[in-house]
Amino acid sequence: MTAAAPVITIDGPSGAGKGTLCKAMAEALQWHLLDSGAIYRVLALAALHHHVDVASEEALVPLAAHLDVRFISTHGNLEVILEGEDVSGEIRTQEVANAASQVAAFPRVREALLRRQRAFREAPGLIADGRDMGTVVFPDAPVKIFLDASSEERAQRRMLQLQEKGFSVNFDRLLSEIKERDDRDRNRAVAPLVPAEDALVLDSTSLTIEQVIEKALQYARQKLALA
């Protein structure tokens, strides 16, 4: 029996820098990449493309089970490919966001997508970006990292991102939203946002992104050399 391809899981709250870290690690190691946060949006978009009713669990399950999606990181940019087409921009529309929240509510859809996410595990290896990658999706991953940062730092980063896009934002409101989301995520009954017992907890509050990438790659290479 062939050994399963290695997986590096990167979990953590919104705004900690998971996406940037995962893209950098996938490029550095030349591994596959899974952006689990985007997968419900991709399924929602596939349903809209194929005129599948997003309110029908029965109709969505087979679509979820055979979802043709890939994630490609090039020069720090993430391309989301659905059925051979780059849909990176399309999955960010409000219509798709609304549909994604509907499809995510169905238990059988979540189960089908769990199996679909596990199918990303292919040689030479996988970088899995999410919130429950190390605890639920890939509990046997040889390398698990939980990337964290203070809520204030994450609000600051989000504010700068939005300002760069021309949006006017209120820091206190952003901070309040982040704290509320953290509370929901950490205390939910199913797959709460907690570090796996065997995860390295990496606090990025006072680190540059280059320092985070360096520490994560160093840790991963050490662990994989021992595995």
UniProtKB/Swiss-Prot annotation:
Keywords from the named record: ATP-binding, Cytoplasm, Kinase, Nucleotide-binding, Transferase
Name of the protein in question = Cytidylate kinase
CDD domains reported for this sequence:
CMPK (cd02020)
Name the family the entry cites: Belongs to the cytidylate kinase family. Type 1 subfamily.
Q: Does the keyword Cytoplasm apply?
A: yes
As its record notes, the protein acts as a catalyst of: CMP + ATP = CDP + ADP; dCMP + ATP = dCDP + ADP
The cross-references to InterPro entries, in alphabetical order and at most eight, read: Cytidylate_kin, Cytidylate_kinase_dom, P-loop_NTPase
| This enzyme's EC code(s) | 2.7.4.25
* Positions contributing to ATP binding: 12-20
State one molecular function term (GO).
ATP binding
Q: Which Gene Ontology BP terms does the record give? A: nucleobase-containing small molecule interconversion; pyrimidine nucleotide metabolic process
Going by the entry's taxonomy, the superkingdom of the source organism is recorded as Bacteria
